[in-house]
Amino acid sequence: MAEGDGAPPSSWEKDLAEALEEGGCDLETVRNIIQGRQLPADLRAKVWKIALNVVGKGDSLASWDGCLDLPEQSIIHKDCQELIDRLSVPEDEKSVLLLDIESVITFYCKSRNVKYSSCLGWIHLLRPLVHLRLPRSDLYNCFYAIMNKYIPRDCFLKGRPFHLFRLLLQYHEPELCSFLDTKKMTPDSYALNWLGSLFSYYCSTEVTQAIWDGYLQQADPFFIYFLMLIILVNAKDVILAQESEKEEMLKFLETSPANLEVEDIEDLFSLAQYYCSKTPASFRKDNHSLFGSSLLGLKDDDTDLSQALCLAVSVSEILQANQQQGEGVRFFVVDCRPAEQYNAGHLSTAFHLDSDLMLQNPSEFAQSVKSLLEAQKQSIESGSIAGGEHLCFMGSGREEEDMYMNMVLAHFLQKNKEYVSIARGGFMALQQHLADINVEGPENGYGHWIASTSGSRSSINSSVDGDSPNGSSDGKGVKSLVNKMTVALKTKSVNVKEKVISFIENTSTPVDRHVSSSDRVGKPYRGVKPVFSIGDEEEYDTDGIDSSSMSDDDRKEVVNIQTWINKPDVKYNFPCNEVKENGHMFPSHLLVTATNMYCLREIPSRKGLAYIQSRQALNSVVKITSKKKHPELITFKYGNSNTSGIEILAVERYLIPNAGDATKAIKQQIMKVLDALES
């Protein structure tokens, strides 16, 4: 992703320059041209202005008298001077630039009625903008837009944004969250300057620009939460192994973004997209009031996230999520109300777990939990509408009745169960929602959602009876399938003895937990401590590359999966998930013959059939890479080798269980092909 200094512009850069020169370019057009690549330095200012929607905005400072006379003016001047001193600016330009920066901060304080303080971090927000050498009016407009759209309100110690981040961390990494909680290391104590400066506080100018290139094009203020999450996830092993004092650990955490390099940013965003795709939409929808200038929707009972036991999900999302196809968030709903309430009426897909049992009959409760986990596993495997990797607990919606449910929730969280949420408002909210959308209407698709196992009925149920999938099991508790990615994050590294030029082999042993390589072919990662390990393997770059090199005819070709697997020339078959750049995953099969590798993508609506998504010659594989923290996420790069280097033509990513075995087999087959060609 590095910029090519002095290199001739590529075709996409020319397209971008022409589009920007013509004017009238919108963000969608810009995104389609850039496709996640790092911006050329000379075009960055124009792209950022489009992304911030300030193109054509007037000069807000035009009517201002220019008086620099705030009570805290001396502090503003001092901070601005320190910024100028750190910049490589010609002497004759320093005074003008200093006045511009000081004017921007002063006018913002006056117009917004805000008292300036150095701890606000505005100087760090301005630093990447100052590097763009913008006119004063554009500098102010860009600064204002960033403050308004991307810096959340209450971004201070014990502020609401950090309570929300803790809930997100707990949702994806309960073990890490619990560890930090016990150490009383709250997110605001280490991430205040991450969020308040959009990482510019600790990151170099080049790294900050690369982060902002992607972040501003995302146009999603909540995406910063997932970037923060990945930084923690990748420091997890080091954090959990720490035995130092709290202050030293906080310093380590707070400064961890400083270890980022430009080459890491593509992977940082890719992993953030993955976690984003595994997060309920309610995370955004219920907290949209954090960003923007509007104060609408801010209520006292909405803002106190510090007391939340876990992430809350709306009942409308629960109903919609389990009807959709594809790789979105799907919920396995656990109804924790007493048996008589459950029998009178319940969500037809809900599993019943009587929370009263936790105190009244602990052994029966433990057996019910085992049954729950087994039922969840079976419902996922069978493709049931009730199936989902995400556990969502539903109570009655009455605080005094839900006390035991909260104890059950705490039980699962203490067991470090990932993807645990609560249905906001409980069953009462579900009933109200179904009433609001007139569930009894003949054309409404939700009519089957309420079921009863007794003679009594809810006032708004349908005529469909149904039981929960309440099967018992003597087996051990089953971990959620979502551990595909996150189990790999919890493991420790081992050395890989065999190194092959141009290949990274990531081996795994046949036990429950995967192990990953700590060796790397190519340049070693900067620094001694493994603080941040995205990119510890060879980097891959999708600049100018179509992620799939097959023709339209290939896309349309439908084949029988088993027939293809049984073909005599197929040497290996690896069930996997194809991973797209947006984080979406598609169940697939990688088939390896003597000379080729095929990706068959399963067709959800046609069991046993698949599209030929990709066919690649083995001798066109120029690189196989994996990530130290994600040994199951494998990237294949295809291309040609010539005197001027390697030309990459296609890049494909797969999430492969036992990826070490798969890459080893593929590598050996590639070597056979290359040996045959040489002989």
From Swiss-Prot:
SUPFAM superfamilies: Rhodanese/Cell cycle control phosphatase, Ypt/Rab-GAP domain of gyp1p. GO terms for cellular component: cytosol; trans-Golgi network. Residues 454-468 have a biased composition (Low complexity). Residues 454-478 are annotated as: Disordered. GO terms for biological process: embryonic brain development; retrograde transport, endosome to Golgi; vesicle tethering to Golgi. It is found in: Golgi apparatus, trans-Golgi network. Residues 327-439 form the Rhodanese domain. Its main location: Golgi. Disulfide bonds: none annotated. Pfam families: RabGAP-TBC, Rhodanese, TBC1D23_C. Putative Rab GTPase-activating protein which plays a role in vesicular trafficking. Involved in endosome-to-Golgi trafficking. Acts as a bridging protein by binding simultaneously to golgins, located at the trans-Golgi, and to the WASH complex, located on endosome-derived vesicles. Plays a role in brain development. May act as a general inhibitor of innate immunity signaling. This is TBC1 domain family member 23.
